[in-house]
Amino acid sequence: MKDIIQKAEELNICHEWQNKMLKHQDMKYFCEMYFKGDDWAMEHDFPTLPLLQKYKGQTEEHGLYLDYKGTIKNKPHLAFFGSSNIVLEYDNFQVALVNIRHQSKAKIIAKNYAIITINILDNAEVEIEKDPTAKVFIYKK
């Protein structure tokens, strides 16, 4: 995982976060850092597609998916990269943050008071289906 830290350093991650990465060298922690600092990550296109490819199979359980095809329900933190094609379902007061990048396509179904924040970057496409009780906030960069 030193290559992840090295790439973050090349992209001028702040010293505080660099030290956190050096101290906690595990995938779960790195993925949690992604969501806590997703503004920096999105601005610097981090993690890179080659890094995600290298660690495919290790990031998914922590919410980062590359070229994923399928349906996921009620997961609070998700990020899709590459050419993912997904359906995301949220209900029963679920609150979530979803980042969709590159060439990914997503259909998001929100109902029963779910609150979803979606960041759309690059050439990603999103279709929203929601009932009157759900709130969906979309930010396109």
Task: Give the predicted meaning of each segment.
Residues 1-102, 107-141:
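Short, glycine-biased loop/turn motifs at secondary-structure junctions and
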